[in-house]
């Protein structure tokens, strides 16, 4: 049962726009959230995903502010987080309102051929907006995803890998350091600030039970520090989006006004009134989006976009360079040998202009612009690990196959066979997979693989060449899900132990 502190009711009554009803607000807070997902276009198109899941009893209603976001209804109970398509990164379970900030950041001049090359996500975990921005960037450029909580960094990293993101570097800092360490370094910054979470009451009925105005005031002080740091880290001409999942103006409009008062000659608010059809319903006088739960039947949310019109003085001097960077550029001869191995074993290629680095006996693929950031601060994780060096040759890493084998070809529009045991090589969903070093799996086989089990080649009903072929990829719905060793009678599973799922479905 929903529990709201009476003090919150009194507080929010003073802030609710006159054209909105308090009764409707309370009713909206009592309704369960509509289930929503975002299709991961790094791995599959929205059209193919809809065609794939519709025969499974899914129906889709588009989220108006995200071309790849959908409210979904299912004809049967299904644990979305445990279904194959989620595990392989075809979609992200994401509340519709939280899709707004990346959409706002990548609009107008920020979405064309001059799209931001260097982007900062200052408070990233668990990764919904990070992976959304990576998809909007099509894995190009550099996306630095920062998270202050050590435990949440692990979740962020897992989601980045699951979704096939390769242009990301992870950091673990208090976001307030970025104004000092990365002064005017980014083309775009997203600050989805830590907040009071007043807008989340529809999924957490206790979110407002202990609400106190003093807590709002305290966290607003932190938000002011963070938005100043975000602005300092932004290049002149760049865009800053500030967002929260809370409703109080103290944490929203007041924070943006604080930045304007701090830098009146360098901050320009950009109106989001035309961000999508119907955006004006939530638009404030300043051009911010203050999303109340009853407007779009969603979580409460706040989004503001600002442009940095001029450089501002840095507050502290340039920090000393970080020493002992453990990576070095790989020699061209070794890169060529690695590329030959990847091509011959998996029929995959490194992206054009790939920045390949070495650490001990490990090859890593770095985002192209990352070299400018070497020595500026400590990074938890950079790009993707490609392969280990063996005595004879290489051993590809799982995350490399997921990223490089993101789209091997699908024909989901012709997928009329939903039998999980149907042989993969005769399933029309896999007919367009022409990669000779990839074995398409059906649902039952994919489940076996993700549970860490070897696959008996007899399950292919004679449709698979039983000649041992060594390392190969396996795919499901046209996207790689891992590596096997083709031994003839069985496909030996190479899934990392930490990714093995004991139960599926």
From Swiss-Prot:
PROSITE patterns assigned: SAM_MT_RSMB_NOP
Keyword rRNA processing assigned: yes
Reaction(s) this enzyme catalyzes, per UniProt: cytidine(1407) in 16S rRNA + S-adenosyl-L-methionine = 5-methylcytidine(1407) in 16S rRNA + S-adenosyl-L-homocysteine + H(+)
Pfam families the UniProt entry points to: Methyltr_RsmB-F (PF01189), Methyltr_RsmF_N (PF17125), Methyltranf_PUA (PF13636), YebU_pre-PUA_dom (PF21150)
Keywords annotated in UniProt: Cytoplasm, Methyltransferase, RNA-binding, rRNA processing, S-adenosyl-L-methionine, Transferase
GO cellular component, one term: cytoplasm
One annotated GO molecular function: RNA binding
Region (Disordered): 409-437
Signal peptide: none
Biased composition regions of type Low complexity, renumbered to the chain: 410-435
PANTHER family for this protein: 28S RRNA (CYTOSINE(4447)-C(5))-METHYLTRANSFERASE-RELATED, NOP2 YEAST -RELATED NOL1/NOP2/FMU SUN DOMAIN-CONTAINING
Protein name per the record: Ribosomal RNA small subunit methyltransferase F
Organism: Shewanella denitrificans (strain OS217 / ATCC BAA-1090 / DSM 15013)
Classification lineage: Bacteria, Pseudomonadati, Pseudomonadota, Gammaproteobacteria, Alteromonadales
Gene field: rsmF
């Amino acid at each position: 049962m929903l529990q709201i502190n009476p003090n919150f009711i009194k507080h929010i009554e003073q802030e609710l726009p006159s054209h909105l009803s308090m009764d409707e607000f309370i009713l909206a807070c009592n309704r369960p959230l509509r289930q929503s997902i975002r299709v991961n276009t790094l791995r599959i198109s929205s059209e193919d995903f809809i065609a794939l899941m519709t025969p499974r009893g899914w129906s889709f209603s588009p989220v108006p502010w995200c071309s790849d976001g959908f409210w979904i209804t299912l004809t049967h109970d299904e644990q979305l987080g445990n279904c194959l398509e989620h595990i392989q990164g075809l979609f992200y379970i994401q509340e519709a309102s939280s899709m707004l900030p990346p959409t706002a950041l990548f609009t107008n001049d920020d979405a064309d051929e001059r799209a931001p090359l260097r982007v900062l996500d200052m408070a990233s975990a668990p990764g919904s907006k990070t992976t959304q921005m990576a998809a909007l960037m099509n894995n190009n450029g550099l996306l630095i995803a920062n998270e202050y909580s050590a435990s949440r960094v692990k979740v962020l990293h897992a989601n980045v890998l699951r979704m096939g993101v390769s242009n990301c570097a992870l950091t673990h800092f208090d976001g307030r350091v970025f104004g000092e360490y990365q002064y005017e370094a980014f083309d775009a910054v997203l600050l989805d600030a830590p907040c009071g979470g007043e807008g989340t009451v529809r999924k957490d009925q206790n979110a407002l039970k202990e609400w106190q105005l003093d807590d709002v005031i305290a966290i607003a002080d932190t938000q002011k520090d963070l938005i100043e740091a975000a602005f300092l880290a932004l290049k002149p001409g760049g865009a800053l989006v500030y967002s929260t999942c809370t409703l109080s103006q103290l944490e929203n409009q007041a924070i943006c006004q604080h930045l304007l008062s701090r830098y009146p000659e360098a901050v320009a608010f950009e109106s989001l009134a035309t961000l999508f059809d119907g955006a004006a319903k939530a638009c404030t006088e300043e051009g911010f989006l203050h999303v109340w739960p009853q407007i779009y039947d969603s979580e409460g949310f706040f989004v503001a976009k600002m442009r940095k019109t001029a450089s501002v003085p840095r507050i502290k001097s340039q920090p000393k360079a970080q020493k002992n960077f453990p990576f070095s550029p790989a020699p061209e001869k070794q890169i060529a040998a690695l590329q030959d191995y990847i091509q011959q074993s998996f029929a995959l290629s490194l992206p054009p202009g790939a920045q390949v680095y070495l650490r001990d006996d490990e090859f890593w693929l770095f985002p192209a612009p990352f070299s400018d950031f070497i020595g500026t601060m400590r990074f938890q994780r950079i790009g993707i690990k490609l392969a280990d060096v063996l005595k004879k040759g290489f051993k590809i890493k799982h995350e490399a196959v997921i990223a490089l084998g993101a789209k091997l070809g699908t024909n989901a529009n012709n997928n009329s066979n939903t039998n999980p045991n149907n042989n993969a090589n005769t399933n029309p969903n896999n007919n367009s997979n022409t990669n000779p070093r990839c074995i398409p799996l059906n649902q039952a086989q994919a489940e076996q693989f993700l549970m860490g089990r070897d696959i008996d080649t007899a399950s292919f009903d004679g449709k698979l060449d039983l000649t041992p072929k060594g390392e190969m990829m396996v795919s499901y719905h046209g996207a790689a899900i891992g590596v096997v060793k083709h031994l003839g009678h069985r496909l030996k599973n190479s899934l990392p132990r930490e990714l093995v799922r004991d139960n599926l479905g």
